[in-house]
Amino acid sequence: MIDLSASPLSTVAVLGLARSGVAAALALQAAGKTVLAWDDNPAAREAAAQAGVTISDLNVADWKLIDALSLSPGIPHSFPTPNPITVKAKAAGCELLSDNELLARAIEGKGIRLVAITGTNGKSTTTALTGHLLRSAGVATEIGGNLGVGALALAPLPTGGVYVLELSSYQLELMPTAVFDVAVLLNISPDHLDRHGGMDGYVAAKRRIFAGQHPGQVSVIGVDDAWCRAIAADLDQRAVTLVRIDPDQPGLDLSQAKALPGRHNAQNAAAAIAICRALGLEDSAIQAGLNSFPGLRHRQQQVATLSGVTFVNDSKATNADAAGNALGCYESIYWIAGGVPKDGGIESLRMFFPRIRHAYLIGHAAKDFSVTLGETPHCLCGDLATAVRMAFAQARRDGLEGAVVLLSPACASFDQYPNFERRGDHFVDLVEQLKVGAPA
């Protein structure tokens, strides 16, 4: 747990009592602060109370007595419709911030480095890889933010340690003063536009990661898209080191990095390499870490190979760009896709359709995806269990070398699952069930 006792904030409201909110409330309470914690969901309030959080109804709070509102990132405060509690907080002049902002303030001036990683796609892999490289080299490191535990539940680090935070656009909006020793923007493509009032708001939230940096700190940016190229051109005008990353020239040998397939992972690796070099690691130590990286669940996770058919869990691919990264890695694909679609659907994936032997469509997007796929062989399966069963049967009948049953939905999961992790776990469970009747 992060020590917040030195914070000048005396009374803090916490809205949203999931993982990060509970961690924030407990850290603030442990620091002797007055905490008013609330969640609109009664079940979340009960679970938080059982964890030791003091519950107070923020709908009737006296906001003149509250210094700051620590807001869970999933709660809207501007677009599309702000939560009523955030409206009251703003009207009272209360500062809105996040648990990640509180962490940044707590370690300021203590000789602990802070790395932040954002981007529409690739954040989690880059964060996990960076943490792995640093730990493999013997650097005291904690990773968190949007990945793993809440920021304030991370372990304290000694001088010279490194916190590596994965940050979403939602989280960056709630970090008004944080400055990062190494700030990374991997890429930008349209996503979460309703929460940011359009593309301009989304880009502005991502760009916030570079705010306030000064000489001696490092900015790392991918330049595969027009938005990032424009940001990089602006960053060139500052007196801060800027590193442009190129997936075609990642900087070290990735041939033995088996958990990092594809061009998109070359970009993730290039970013992690740039981060570690900025923090003083030798290339030999970085290379050893690349080769030993085990990968992440739900990100092109190879689950099993049955009867010559490989099953890949890429449930984290919640938009077309992410799914395209996976589709570009394999030649004979039995593709499971669908869920709650993002703007544009899968139109941008047409270049990969020749690789798709058959597509199995699930969830709300199935009919729209069917129209886009056109003459590409496909069927509407409805649910994941049916899709896995049908994909495996077809792949076995076809007998193609290198056949892959790929769950890379290009959609959010919320029509059938609470999150992408549950969707991916169900896929893994279904593959395990197939093992009973299939030769390895």
Can you describe what each PLM-predicted range is?
Residues 1-98, 102, 261, 281, ...:
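N-terminal leader/targeting and accessory segments in enzymes
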Residues 2-11, 23-31, 140, 258-356, ...:
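Nucleotide phosphate-binding/pyrophosphate-handling subdomain across enzymes
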Residues 11, 64, 73, 77-223, ...:
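Phosphate-binding loop of NTP-binding sites
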Residues 28, 69, 117, 146, ...:
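Residue-level signal for inorganic ion chemistry
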Residues 33-40, 219-223, 336-337, 354-365:
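Short internal beta-strands
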Residues 34-39, 142-143, 164, 244, ...:
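Short beta-strand "acidic-cap" motif of Rossmann-like dinucleotide-binding folds
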Residues 39-44, 58-59, 101, 148, ...:
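Short, polar loop motifs at secondary-structure junctions
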Residues 85, 346-403, 438-440:
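C-terminal helical cap/extension that packs against the catalytic core
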